[in-house]
Every structure is written in structure tokens, then in C-alpha cells.
A protein has these predicted regions:
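Secretory-pathway ectodomains
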Residues: 1-344
Length: 344
């Protein structure tokens, strides 16, 4: 099978929005732009569907079911109906928060690099839950929390969240409603993550892959615990590995390596364009990586470049929509790419 990577459309955001100001779900795309607008766009065409005024375009956007949340840099958390754009509630005085994830009926907020402890907000009312969660003491660098589906056989996501700190060699799974610890796992070294805080890559089968230290790739399945998948022979970039089936994609400073876990064999991707490799995302059984020079490359399981395309601006973040689209935001541009697979 061959990958086809095609640019569908590109939109000028007029200001350099935060990379976290973009959120996507199947059939849904929302971005903060033009200093003070939150806009829902048609993912296929880029046509605006609704817009609302917010405080800035440097905050964090999340889509969760029928809700869209926007946490402004000014410290106001807004909740909108994702279909109509109607504002449901707004909660102020949440300064120094940056991370948002939703688990069940609860939104988790935390400060970038742990500048503010993890807090919980009721999605129905916007009210804060009392108390402080375990593992959320201020002063420690916290990875972006991850909602965890405890029962992959069910269609809904159970209300639990995975926590990791740059200073503790452990993972913590916390119940969203009660704050009670549901699981705790020791690691060889603390979870390693970049300045953005994104540490985990979650697969559809419930496996969560991450770096423990600079060279060890590990996987967590909440039902069975953690295990070491691969020990690399040199330092990896502080970016989440990608795991699909029994294939790993690892990001090094200037290159990409694929690992066949069944054979314990590795393949360095050849003929890469010059420059650094950025984050990657899984696409149709392969992996898509941002490269210096505004380039995207699709790398297959054999370690071959299956497709490449150049975008209008530098790529700060890639965000799949859960179907065949990938959205790229960076340097004042939003670009949507269609990833299709064709028989060879």
C-alpha cells in the first residue's frame, strides 16, 4: 500500500496562535485566531461555521463530545456547544493554567511545567472541585495528562487520567470524579517529554507508549501494567514514540528509525531532507513526521519514505482528526492534509 499526502487547504491565522489553540475530532475542527476569535471550521474546506469572541489566541482548545473548551492565557475557561457555538459557561481566575484534558464529565487543568497544581472542573457547571489531586504538588514539571480508556471494549472513555512528572520515576492513574489513585507503576527513569509537555502516544488498542529516560521505550496497558519495548543505543529526542502493531517509529535529532519488535531489527530512514525531525503522528498504519523546511514525510513500516509534501509555513504541531485528515499549525498558518492509502 502507498500513501498519498495532499494539501486540501491552508488558512492564514493573522497572528501566531498557540500550537495548543487547535483542536480536532472526526468532522470537527476548532482554532483560536486573529487575537480574540475562536472559530469552528469545516475540516474538508476550511470554511468558517461559527465564531465566538475570547480573550486571546494563545490559549488551549479541546473538543470533548458535544463540548468545546477554550482556556485563554488570561485565565478564563470557556465552554461552548461545539455544534452551534453557543457559550454554555465561563470560569475566570484560572491564571497560570495551560494543560486541559477531559476524562468523563471532568476537565483537568494544570499549569505549564507544573506552575499550578492539577485542578478539576465540572463540565456541566464550570465549577471547581475542592481539594488537590495526588501527584500534583507545585514545583514539579508535569507532563500533559492523558485520559485513559479503562475498558477498550466499551465505546466510551472511562473517567481516569494518567499523570507523570519529570522528577518522579512513576506513572499514576487517577479517578476523575473522586481523585482516588486507580493505579501506580514504577519506571526505570522519569518520563521524558518536550517543552510542550506531550509525553504519551495512545493507540486504539489501549496501549500507551512513552520514553523513560533518554533511551528506553516503554508501554503501559492499564489492565496489565508497564513493560520495556526497546532500549535504544543512543539518545532519542524528547518526543513520544509511535507504536502500531509490532512496529515502532523513533525520532532522533536529525532522523527517524523504525523498529520491528518481532525481529528486534531496526531501519534508519534514508534520503531524508536536511534539518531536524519534529513530532510525528500515526496515519493509516504508517507515521507522519514534521521536518525542518516546512516539510512533511510519511514513513512506512519498512522505514521507507512513502510520501512527502511541503507546507506554506513551519510546522509546530500535527493533529490527526481520527479519520484521514491531519491538521498542521505553525507560524500563523493552519493547513489541512488528506492522507489516503492506495494499492501498489
Amino acid at each position: 500500500m502507498d500513501q498519498q499526502v495532499r494539501v486540501l487547504w491552508s488558512r492564514l491565522l493573522h497572528l501566531r496562535s498557540s500550537a495548543a489553540a487547535l483542536a480536532a475530532a472526526p468532522g470537527i475542527l476548532v482554532v483560536a485566531e486573529r487575537h480574540s476569535r475562536l472559530v469552528r471550521l469545516d475540516p474538508q474546506t476550511g470554511v468558517p461555521l461559527w465564531e465566538q469572541n475570547v480573550e486571546d489566541c494563545w490559549g488551549t482548545t479541546v473538543v470533548a463530545g458535544d463540548r468545546c473548551l477554550y482556556l485563554s492565557q488570561a485565565g478564563v475557561l470557556h465552554c461552548f456547544d461545539v455544534h452551534s457555538g453557543q457559550r454554555t459557561w465561563s470560569t475566570p481566575k484560572l491564571c497560570l493554567c495551560h494543560y486541559i484534558i477531559v476524562a468523563g464529565s471532568v476537565a483537568f487543568l494544570s499549569g505549564w511545567r507544573g506552575y499550578r497544581p492539577l485542578i478539576r472542573v465540572d463540565l456541566t457547571s464550570g465549577e471547581l472541585f475542592p481539594g488537590q489531586l495526588p501527584g500534583s504538588a507545585p514545583g514539579g514539571s508535569l507532563a500533559w495528562p492523558l485520559p485513559v480508556r479503562l475498558d477498550p471494549e466499551r465505546s466510551y472513555t472511562a473517567g481516569a487520567v494518567l499523570l507523570a512528572s519529570a522528577s518522579e520515576a512513576a506513572l499514576l492513574l487517577v479517578d476523575a470524579l473522586t481523585g482516588v489513585t486507580r493505579g501506580e507503576w514504577s519506571l526505570p527513569e522519569p518520563v521524558r517529554f518536550p517543552d510542550s509537555g506531550v509525553a504519551f502516544s495512545a493507540g486504539e488498542d489501549g496501549r500507551i507508549v512513552f520514553l523513560s529516560g533518554r533511551r528506553t521505550v516503554m508501554v503501559l496497558h492499564p489492565a496489565s501494567g508497564v513493560e520495556i519495548l526497546w532500549r535504544h543505543d543512543r539518545d532519542l529526542r524528547s518526543l513520544p514514540p509511535i507504536l502500531s502493531g509490532r512496529t515502532l517509529w523513533l525520532t532522533e535529532d536529525t532522523g527517524v528509525t523504525t523498529i520491528d519488535l518481532d525481529r528486534s531489527s531496526r531501519t534508519a530512514v534514508m534520503h531524508l531532507p536536511p534539518g531536524a525531525t519534529g513530532e510525528g503522528v500515526p496515519v493509516s498504519g504508517d507515521a507522519l513526521f514534521a521536518r525542518a523546511g516546512n516539510q512533511l514525510i510519511a514513513v512506512n513500516r519498512a522505514g521507507e519514505i512513502a510520501a512527502r509534501v511541503r507546507l506554506p509555513a513551519r510546522i509546530d504541531r500535527l493533529l490527526p482528526d481520527g479519520r484521514s485528515l491531519v491538521h498542521a499549525i505553525g507560524k500563523g498558518h493552519l493547513t489541512t492534509i488528506d492522507i489516503s492509502t492506495t494499492p501498489t
